[in-house]
Design a protein with these regions (language model features):
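Short intrinsically disordered terminal tails
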Residues: 1-2, 94-101
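Acidic, low-complexity, intrinsically disordered interaction modules
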Residues: 25-88
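Intrinsic low-complexity, glycine/proline- and repeat-rich
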Residues: 88-94
């Protein structure tokens, strides 16, 4: 069963590496906030009402983060880059499948 807590545990390492993403609890679930480097203003905030929504959002954030790391943000991503990032995401998808049993 997915819970907010185990989703956050699974993505703990990623969230520790990405200085622009933060997840905070709120009355309606959890909010993922994106910061713009050193700005005091956030870029966006997304309310996740269910653990599934939080998982999906963090997986997409992780995918984007790893793709930017591969390209260093200096070139267009290739199909090989995208495939490599898909492979990095697979353990998260496998974990989700097991957690939903």
């Amino acid at each position: 069963m997915l819970t907010f807590e185990n989703v956050l545990t699974v993505f703990r390492d990623y969230l520790g590496q990405d200085p622009e993403e933060e997840v905070l609890p709120c009355r309606r679930g959890y909010v993922r906030i994106s910061w713009n480097s050193d700005s005091r203003y956030c870029v966006d905030g997304v309310l996740c009402r269910t653990p599934e929504e939080l998982f999906d959002l963090l997986l997409q954030d992780y995918w984007d983060f790893e793709l930017i790391r591969r390209t260093r943000g200096r070139r267009e991503a290739t199909a090989a880059d995208e495939k490599a990032v898909d492979e990095l995401c697979q353990p998260y998808l496998d974990w989700r499948k097991e957690a939903q049993k």
